[in-house]
Amino acid sequence: MTDLLNRLSTARPSETELQAMWSEDRRQALLDRIEETHDARPSRHRYGTAIGLVAAAATAFLVIPAAVDTPSAAATDLRSLALTAASYEGSVLEQGTWLHEQSTSVQRDSRTLSDGAVYERERETWTRWDGRTLLIERDPSAGWTSYDVINGSRAISDPEAPAFDDPASYQDPTPQFAAALPDTAEGLLSYLDGRVFGSSSHEEAMYSALVGLATSHTLPPDTLAATYEALATVEGVTTDNVRVEGQPAVEVGFRDDLSGSVETMTVDAATGQVLAVKTDSSQSSYTSTTTLSQVVPEIPAAVVDAFSEHDEGIRYTASGDPMQN
């Protein structure tokens, strides 16, 4: 996490650079786009009342005018993240590059409803433009490491080896798929509205879909910004200002009233990049934290060699021997 925050801090432009990149006209144009999305939603007016004040021989009336439909605190936070994400100047994925990421995950099963088991994983991936992914996965407690290729053959030495013809989707986006998504909140909402499924409510399904896109780290800056703008329109989404290793962050959450589970996504307030996701339910809790996310031109030779020396679907001990079942 520290390495990722350091990279994000380095990547973030200075205030002088931001002012140069974001002229008053450009900032106003983006704000106008956000307000257009907000204004398109049905307003919920709150009407004031007339209060009669009687004093001696005179009667006066105080009328409270109809209140403006102001954005919620969550919507304000999310639109701020959208502005930040749109101005992010880090490297952007394109054909010929790889997304290199490191992450850790912890699942804790309930001691009351389950066996209380704890599962830890460390993952390192290299994802190509078309979705071909090299995955190194480790279990620190069990002491094993595996080397698998997702959506592609093990011809690692051939950088042009094609990915398998597995269709990408909003649930499993490739960089190529993400680049073609709508880059406005209205467009994203329209695209997802008829596609999301499998949840206890449409709002929860939309939240999960938008968070899944954001946490993939495959979205171009404008599309990531549109994702936050879209989340600002989903009923039930909450935000909380938190700190991660001393740095300001925003926790974006949604509670499923039917199951009681709570999903959260933690976003770096300075860059708009996703740091972690978490799901809490009565059965278990699951947290996945991204510790490194960067765009690289190629896979290191040592990694290519490691995949050439290890077989698919085999777990290896620290000494490099296959584990016995």
Where do the protein language model's features map onto the residues?
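N-terminal export/targeting signals for secretion/compartment entry
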Residues: 1-80
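Intrinsically disordered, low-complexity prosegments and terminal tails associated
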Residues: 52-325
